Amino acid sequence: MEELLSASPLLLEQKMKWINVNEQYLDYLRKVEKRIPRTDYGEDRYKPFFGILFEKDGLYYITQVSHAQPRHNKLKQQKDFYKVYDPKSPTRLIAVINLNYMFPIPKSEVFPFEKNQIHTYRTFTSEKEKSKYIDLLDIELSAINSMDIGTKAKELYSLKCNKPEHVVSKRCIDFKNMERLALQYKGEEKS
């Protein structure tokens, strides 16, 4: 299994980055798996994906953060659920990562997330609101990059593939089926 998840040396050293994903590809996956996250939640709401968690068979695995909710404070971190705390205020929960919702994407469907173009992704009531949102994204990404989340993603992938009956595995998206769909989508694009 380890050789299946080996990343190129470049990816091993790469820090996580915010990325955009072709919405048509996401809709394609959602026809089969309703838990594929959304980026667009209306004019004033937007959540980019991040990655690259790891690469497998020419596909990138990516995921997304979710806004912290009061109920998240009571939940324990597990192999598929991680809390993201503000590095400057270590008790302040700012986001959570549901790794069980990570999924594969053809490399051709990943696009850079440009902070200076944030106004094209969502609306803001003021420059101050826009600046605060960009600051939050920077803080979240800094925290994520301190968590070794790529290694944790590979471990979860291995658990799901090797022990599908494990309680954590049952909460995960069917990674193998998503890989099949991703490769199928890639093939349809070439036609």
Q: Which role does the model predict for each range below?
A:
Residues 30, 35-38, 45, 71, ...:
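Arginine residue identity/basic-tract feature
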Residues 11-46, 52:
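Short N-terminal edge-element motif at the start of the domain
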Residues 1-9, 72:
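Positively charged N-terminal leader segments that act as targeting/secretion signals
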Residues 32-36, 75-78, 109-120:
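Surface-exposed beta-strand edges and their flanking turn/coil or helix-capping segments
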Residues 10-13, 84-191:
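C-terminal terminal-subdomain/extension
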Residues 42-45, 55-95:
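Compact nucleic-acid interaction/catalytic patches
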Residues 25, 69, 109:
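Residue-level detector of flexible, active-site-proximal loop/helix-junction positions
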